[in-house]
Amino acid sequence: MRIGKLLLLSAACAALSGPALSSTALTQPAGDLARQQATAQRVQITRDDWGIAHVHGKSDADAVFGMIYAQAEDDFPRIEANYLTNLGRTAEAEGEKAVWQDLRMRLFVDPADLQARYDRSPAWLKVLMDAWADGLNYYLATHPDVKPKVLTRFEPWMALSFTEGSIGGDVERISLGELEAFYGKPRMQASAEVRAREFAQAVAFREPTGSNGFAIAPSNTKDGHALLLINPHTSFFFRSELQVTSDAGLNAYGAATWGQFFVYQGFNAHTGWMHTSSTVDVVDEFAETIQSQGGKLFYKYGAEQRPVETRAVEVAYRAADGSLAKKSFTTYRTHHGPIVRAADGKWVAFAMMYKPVEALEQSFLRTKAVDYASFLKVAELKANSSNNTLFADDKGEVAYLHPQFIPRRDDRFDYTKPVDGANPAADWKGLHALSEAPHLKNPPNGWLMNTNNWPYSAAGPYSPKQADYPRYMDSVGETPRGIHATRVLSARKDFTLPTLIQAAYDPYLTAFADLIPTLSKAYDATPDGDPAKARLAAQMAALKAWDLKWSADSTQTSLAVFWGEALWARSAAQAKKEGASVYKYMAERTTPAQKLEALAEASDRLSADFGDWRTPWGTINRFQRNDGAIVQTFDDAKASIPVPFASGQWGSLASFGAKRYPGTKKYYGTSGNSFVAVVEFGPRVKALAVSAGGESGDPTSKHFLDQAQRYADGALRPAYFYPDQLTGHVERNYRPGE
């Protein structure tokens, strides 16, 4: 029987025209390769002159097969890295240092559980997961030069480990230091040193992850068509830009996170969707009172003593000699969730959404929505916990949706801190109905926005009212980018795609509009005899004359950013301890002396690193892509491109998260604006877009860096959505495997 199967497989291999097959092909079960070859014949991939894949399949499953194959062509290492992360298997590639990261994921992700969930999935979804695995395995089979670090074969159920396309999942809120202290030997509460280190990391200046989304109603556009800004702020090269279509009605264009078979932020012929990381509080900690009785563990819940669940978890890791070793853990769980740390004599359980099947359904089905009603019907799956949505369609509808997975809780409790797990009143009480969250549709002002700020300014004066909702609907408040978005969206009622781009790249830095006057006041109040008065006179004159706008030539931007970072370092820790806004603390709570000391520090650092405190911002702030590594090494001696826009922390809508790296004086960006698109929903959808660097992760490809200058300039290019738009812009037509 087995010999017969091998003979059939050998015959199939011999019949294949095209590249030599890898050993992966020979290890597949008999029939898999033949099935994959047959699917490939129903798929067409067209690469445009930017290297972007336009994938067409007869069925949705065929399209998924081609979509994931094309992604693998562009950057298989990032696909594998994402699944190693989400399966809890990173340590098998990176070694023992990643064990705690993997254990954190494995508290939720269990391969046997995912396989069972796959078996119970709707038939249509199983077909897509099967096609996804086939596409990746066929890529590996036809590319013998590609050597996976770990995942030499993909199984359909693995797709359920990575169902939501945002940059950081809820699970990442679990402290690795606290987790190691609890599950290490001996078990203990995290040390003061660990907590201090993690606190310092939490308050350090860094680029906020998230996104900008604007939806403009027809009443505020020149041509009477709804417009949408799609502007995710992620780590660079985190997503693939592509189009995926089928004869079954699939036709989605936009950004897909590497390894996923749905367009996460994008549009189809009728609707567009933009997700922004939400400030809603949907992740909670419950402090459990643990007792040992008869050698078993119990936790208090009301008048009950409930047994603590245990589960054995083995985490494999790559040893120094290259072999695989394992660490074994006994993990603990209550009905609230897994235990992730100890604090104040209690064990802390972590509660978050875990609905992988529904999440994958929702992520795919919304790409086929034809209007707001059908989009909202998909949202009723309530499997999105972490993202707001800005929506627009060709009916002229615009909308803002808060996340749909929002546990109903007793608002008397402060869920920003661990609540008493023994008190049933603190438990989750089901989920809120969509109508109970701050959603908006077609507000009279004609625009909607979110920039990872609260929902209570989403539509200017027509926004939801904070008093109407529980406290946990927002945990951040307003932000400099939110204030900036309101400013640009309120400024006109005749938006077009070009003017929407102008708004998205408006150079005003709202945070400094509040901060610089406090610095001026501190300086003006300084006695004339104080040495700082004369030393900082030129710097203050420059900042007082500044228009608060970034540009590559602006020396004031450099000085203001360096001053802001220095003052942040003096403010953030205490602001966090007091639960205060860092910006408010910087403006109101730092002393005049601290403000001036920070300015002197900024001036000195500019002079030391660049020879003059009057250094243009573009000389410092650079985009560099010199290799295809997931974690890049930057080098001042290598070519780079000046970027005029600044950090979103200062209110820049076009965000560029940059800093110094070991051995560099210049700042290099690694996050912020990544994929940017503007879309007009007229009789024919029209879109312009740009991606950081280029579509390919291969440094030898001409599409590795071909969009870099456009990215820095904010010069979006046409997105070829219709076949006639591709005419004259096609580099290659082929089928997978050719």
List each model region and its residues.
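Gram-negative bacterial Sec-dependent N-terminal signal peptides
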Residues: R2-L21
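Substrate-recognition/specificity elements adjacent to catalytic centers across diverse enzyme folds
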Residues: L26-R239, D247-G249, G254-F262, F267, ...
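Short, solvent-exposed cationic patches
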Residues: I68-A93, G294-Y301, D420-L431, S435, ...
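N-terminal leader/propeptide and maturation segments of large enzyme subunits in energy/redox metabolism
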Residues: E94-M129, A133-D145, F286, A342-A343, ...
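Acidic, low-complexity N-terminal propeptides/linkers enriched in Ser/Thr/Asp/Gly that mediate export
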Residues: L125-L229, T234-S235, K382, D394-V398, ...
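Glycine- and hydrophobic-rich flexible loops that cap the catalytic core of alpha/beta enzyme folds
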Residues: G249, Y253-Q260, G266-T271, H275-V419
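Hydrophobic alpha-helical segments
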Residues: A252-G254, N384-R492
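Proteins synthesized as precursors that undergo proteolytic processing into mature forms
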Residues: A359-N387, D394-K395, K465-S520
